[in-house]
């Protein structure tokens, strides 16, 4: 079980999240020794003070639709790092993918990576909205742009990670880019299959329920 837990970004990104929810999430994360907590940007500073370095903090920018301008995303990223984030999950502009404006996407990723330096960047491509050719192209763009991870989903779209997507990403992404599966991890079996297929990070808000074999309907 430890090999699964060390890949987990223990996540809470729902609109109604309270500070009490964040504290519970952080305590659970410490107890389970997961990879990180993934939380809203507005809670990063308080969570950093609360955790005192016990667990890495991940947050999101351009979330969940990716429509923010590059300048806005860069500001969000810098602000998150200044407040104590160790990792940043950014959403690309899906419209840019549909418009085949890949140069703009690559430039944006590079600017955000430059802004956060040696902190970890994960690029969310929202696979549920993409066809196979678009997914392959985004693997290439993310690889060339210097991101640390490519991530399947926000968990807010029409679908989450699939085993087929992870296998496709593993085939086409560069060897220096890791894969994060998110929004589709509903059981221990799911987690094991995603890891076996090539995912090195799992984003889920359901890990506690998964460990108890309870129903999982959340992100």
UniProtKB/Swiss-Prot annotation:
Keyword flag Lyase: yes
Keyword Lyase: yes
Alphabetically ordered keywords of this record: Cytoplasm, Lyase, Schiff base
Compartments (UniProt record): Cytoplasm
Catalysed conversion reaction: 2-deoxy-D-ribose 5-phosphate = D-glyceraldehyde 3-phosphate + acetaldehyde
GO biological process terms held by the UniProt record: 2-deoxyribose 1-phosphate catabolic process; carbohydrate catabolic process; deoxyribonucleotide catabolic process
Covalent S-S links between cysteines: none
Enzyme class, spelled out: lyase
GO CC terms, sorted: cytoplasm
Lineage top rank: taxon: Bacteria
Pfam families, sorted: DeoC
GO molecular function: deoxyribose-phosphate aldolase activity
Active-site residue list: 89, 151, 180
Pathway listed: Carbohydrate degradation; 2-deoxy-D-ribose 1-phosphate degradation; D-glyceraldehyde 3-phosphate and acetaldehyde from 2-deoxy-alpha-D-ribose 1-phosphate: step 2/2
Transmembrane segments: none
UniProt EC number: 4.1.2.4
Protein's job: Catalyzes a reversible aldol reaction between acetaldehyde and D-glyceraldehyde 3-phosphate to generate 2-deoxy-D-ribose 5-phosphate.
Family (UniProt): Belongs to the DeoC/FbaB aldolase family. DeoC type 1 subfamily.
HAMAP family: DeoC_type1
UniProt protein name: Deoxyribose-phosphate aldolase
